[in-house]
Regions:
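Short glycine/proline- and aromatic-enriched beta-strand/turn motifs that initiate or cap beta-hairpins
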Residues: 20-86
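Cleavable N-terminal export/targeting peptides
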Residues: 1-27, 185
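Flexible, solvent-exposed loop segments that connect beta-strands
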Residues: 38-42, 75-94, 122-136, 166-170
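Transmembrane beta-strands of outer-membrane beta-barrel pores
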Residues: 34-40, 56, 71-80, 105, ...
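Membrane-embedded beta-strands of outer-membrane beta-barrel proteins
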Residues: 48-54, 99-101, 140-144, 177-179
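Short loop/turn motifs that connect adjacent beta-strands in outer-membrane beta-barrel proteins
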Residues: 22-28, 56-67, 104-113, 146-157, ...
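Membrane-embedded beta-strand positions of outer-membrane beta-barrel proteins
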Residues: 28-34, 67-74, 99, 113-117, ...
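Outer-membrane beta-barrel "beta-signal"
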Residues: 172-185
Length: 185
């Protein structure tokens, strides 16, 4: 009897193993983002994101649609400031993931929009001299991107987020704004 894991592996092997079909139907593109976020409850942090975008389809009269999956990394501090979530400072690097859809238009070139969900784990956050504790964030991200000229050198990213901050002794909602750069496709 074939187990569920074996069946799943066989299906994945069949789809992914035939690179001609997989590559022609669903091209996979690398994606990189870096952006700085500020929030209405005091959050301020810089995020680096690395992952892939899977091309789903092109709308003949509109955008191409991509499914993206990103690994997120937030350092304890950057050049000019310490990272904060709400009013709490990070004691070590945080990480998370993002999954969402991204629409990218050809005309006008560089115009795009994203809707995604993010989950960030803040392993050690503290306020003052208090003992560091764990926190997390669940974020609904809405983003827009555009280019500043041709040839395409810079793709700007603007984000508006609604975040649920699950802090050690409190839960808060926060509106966040982010500005950064992303890869072009």
């Amino acid at each position: 009897m074939i187990s569920f894991k074996q069946k799943l592996f066989f299906v994945l092997y069949t789809v992914l193993g035939n690179s001609t079909i997989f590559g022609a139907t669903f091209p996979v593109l690398p994606e990189f983002q870096v952006y700085h976020t500020v929030g209405s409850r005091g959050s301020t942090y810089t995020t680096g994101a690395l992952g892939i975008s899977l091309h789903l389809f092109d709308d003949p009269s509109g955008p191409g649609r991509y499914l993206h999956v990103l690994a997120l990394s937030i350092p304890e501090k950057t050049i000019a400031w310490k990272s904060k979530v709400g009013s709490l400072y990070l004691s070590e690097k945080a990480s998370g993931f993002e999954i969402g859809v991204h629409d990218q238009w050809q005309m006008p070139a560089g115009k795009g929009a994203t809707l995604s969900l993010r989950k960030i784990q803040w392993p050690k956050v503290h306020e003052g001299d208090n003992e560091p504790e764990e926190a997390s964030s669940d974020i609904l991200h809405m983003g827009w991107n555009w280019i500043t000229g041709t040839p395409i050198i810079t793709v700007w990213l603007l984000g508006l987020d609604i975040a649920n901050l699950n802090l050690p002794h409190d839960r808060k909602q926060e509106i966040q704004i982010a500005l950064g750069l992303r890869t072009a496709f």
